[in-house]
């Protein structure tokens, strides 16, 4: 009786919605919904006010004012999510010179191309974890000016002096200067707090820190810890005060464990994660974002003479291939 009532109620709801012209109806030849054990054939998805309100068997008839999307010859599945992207640029042999040859306007224009490519590849939601224009790109997409996925933006990453995301790494001394918290370079608790507040002011959705060295930075160490624990604690505390979580880039185990103990929400890359780190992640509820394809990519490109600066190549060859193996161990141990 309850099921009959629901069906009648839903039929009435459909009639009302059709009269108001509020429905988008998608006819799916094959539907992979992410929950069923196998693909389902001849299905309809009903959408109202940007929300899926029902998925039902058969092809629901569209009302006069409804928007029907006929995909009866296609396979339909939910949009994919990528939790670690950088839409302002791409890896190429000219990347390191682009810091000196491209303006922010140039990065902004090319980011629209990368955003559209990402959406057309099936990714409808992404976390952009560090870039010069990602807040503005998100706003442009949300306002309908640019085609792209829904973006949760970290704004500019937060690093320490000489750390992985210090924008002056590899420059001559006269150009290095002292970038400071607004540019994402911190030293000490006060700087750490200020950098988070600056990103909140700039419209970030979350905070990204580089807890260890990195592969692509122009620095010889790709795994050393780069924050003291008190700095990370302050970043996490301040971010939480402003309703944001913290994602931590980390390759080496020690810097990773400092970040996990401090309460970051996710570990990015996690290449040299050890058993202790895995145990801490399970205890703290920390998520793991392995970036497997990035590891494979940098290892492959490191074999090409001149693709990366010489200081980067050995790091890419060492760290890149290990991510896939680490992911397997982390998954088997129960890390989320």
Give residue spans per PLM region.
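Sec-dependent N-terminal signal peptides
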Residues: 5-17
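Histidine-rich, glycine-flanked metal-binding segment
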Residues: 24-25, 31, 35-77
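Divalent metal-coordination and catalytic microenvironments
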Residues: 29, 45, 50, 73, ...
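Metal-associated gating/positioning segment near the N- to mid-region
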Residues: 74-143, 161-168, 230, 254, ...
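Divalent metal-dependent hydrolysis catalytic cores, especially in the metallo-beta-lactamase
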Residues: 110-137, 148-157, 204-217, 245, ...
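Histidine/acidic-residue-rich, glycine-tolerant segments that coordinate divalent metal ions
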Residues: 135, 142-258, 273
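Active-site core of metal-dependent hydrolases
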Residues: 161, 210-325, 332-336
């Amino acid at each position: 009786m309850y099921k009959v009532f629901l069906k009648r109620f839903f039929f009435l709801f459909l009639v009302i919605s059709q009269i108001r012209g509020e429905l988008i109806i998608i006819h799916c030849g094959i539907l992979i919904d992410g929950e069923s054990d196998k693909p389902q054939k001849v299905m309809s998805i009903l959408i109202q006010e940007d929300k899926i309100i029902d998925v039902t068997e058969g092809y629901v008839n569209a009302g006069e004012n409804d928007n029907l999307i006929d995909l009866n010859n296609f396979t339909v599945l939910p949009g994919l999510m990528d939790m670690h992207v950088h839409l302002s640029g791409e890896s190429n042999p000219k990347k390191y010179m682009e810091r000196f040859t491209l303006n922010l306007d140039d990065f902004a224009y090319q980011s629209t191309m990368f955003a559209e490519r990402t959406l057309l590849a099936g990714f409808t939601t992404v976390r952009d974890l560090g870039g010069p224009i990602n807040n503005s790109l998100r706003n442009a997409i949300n306002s309908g000016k640019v085609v792209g996925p829904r973006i949760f933006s970290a704004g500019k990453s937060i690093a320490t002096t000489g750390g992985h995301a210090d924008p002056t790494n590899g420059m001559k001394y006269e150009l290095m200067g002292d970038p400071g918290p607004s540019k994402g370079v911190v030293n000490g608790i006060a700087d750490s707090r200020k950098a988070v507040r600056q990103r909140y002011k700039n419209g970030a959705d979350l905070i990204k820190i580089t807890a260890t060295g990195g592969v692509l930075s122009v620095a010889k160490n790709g795994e050393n810890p780069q924050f003291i624990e008190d700095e990370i604690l302050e970043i996490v505390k301040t971010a939480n005060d402003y309703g944001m979580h913290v994602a931590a880039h980390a390759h080496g185990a020690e810097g990773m464990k400092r970040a996990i103990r401090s309460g970051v929400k996710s570990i990015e890359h996690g290449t040299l994660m050890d058993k202790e780190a895995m145990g801490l992640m399970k205890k703290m509820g920390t998520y793991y974002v392995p970036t497997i394809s990035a590891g494979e990519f940098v290892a492959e490109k490191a074999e090409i003479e001149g693709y990366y600066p010489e200081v980067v190549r050995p790091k890419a060859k060492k760290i890149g291939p290990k991510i896939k193996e680490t992911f397997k161990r982390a998954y088997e141990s129960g890390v989320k």
